[in-house]
Amino acid sequence: MPSNALWLRADQLSSVSPAVLDWLFDEGSLTRRLTALADGAFRVEPLLEGWQTLRDDECQGLDVPTGSSGWVREVYLHGHDRPWVFARSVAARSALEGSGFDLALLGTRSLGELLFSDSAFERGPIEVCRYPAAGLPAEVRAEGLWGRRSRFSRGALGVLVAEVYLPRLWDQAGIADV
């Protein structure tokens, strides 16, 4: 992602509606929340998976050296067959190797479901930003979309999960003041 992403904690925000804050800082499973909102009509659409050089802000979020290699997984989280969330999850190669955790095997399964079902994973603080449009797939690219990220840790393994809330989600949730 371009370096103009400014990740903020809840106490650093102002003028954000309570309804938006509720979605951004909900510490439960986003997969479960989306599934409920979609009355079960939820699915994961993988867009990209593979080894890449991690972005600078991702290296910082994972506490690994700038330019580190890692596994990158980008997906849409769909409700009613429409993309509601763009998610990008990354883990450093150095931490993944030998961890017994293989992101390549997820396919159309939700990473969030896996992370929340394994009590060994601990979730770090949630940070939010107005996600840079350049970091989004072309078909949903827009300025000013809210994104959030948090690190899930299990021993030496860290998985950084970023989720960008797309306009159709806010429409479905009945939230206008985004």
UniProtKB/Swiss-Prot annotation:
GO terms for biological process: pyruvate biosynthetic process; ubiquinone biosynthetic process. It is found in: Cytoplasm. Gene3D superfamilies: Chorismate lyase-like. Substrate binds at residues 73, 111, 163. Keywords: Cytoplasm, Lyase, Pyruvate, Ubiquinone biosynthesis. One of its GO terms (molecular function) is chorismate lyase activity. GO terms for cellular component: cytosol. It catalyses: chorismate = 4-hydroxybenzoate + pyruvate. Pathway: Cofactor biosynthesis; ubiquinone biosynthesis. Its EC number is 4.1.3.40. Its main location: cytoplasm. It comes from the Bacteria. It holds the Pfam family Chor_lyase. InterPro entries: Chorismate--pyruvate_lyase, Chorismate_lyase_/UTRA_dom_sf. PANTHER family: CHORISMATE PYRUVATE-LYASE (PTHR38683:SF1). Belongs to the UbiC family. Removes the pyruvyl group from chorismate, with concomitant aromatization of the ring, to provide 4-hydroxybenzoate (4HB) for the ubiquinone pathway. HAMAP family: UbiC. This is Probable chorismate pyruvate-lyase. It comes from Pseudomonas aeruginosa (strain ATCC 15692 / DSM 22644 / CIP 104116 / JCM 14847 / LMG 12228 / 1C / PRS 101 / PAO1). The lineage of its organism: Bacteria, Pseudomonadati, Pseudomonadota, Gammaproteobacteria, Pseudomonadales.
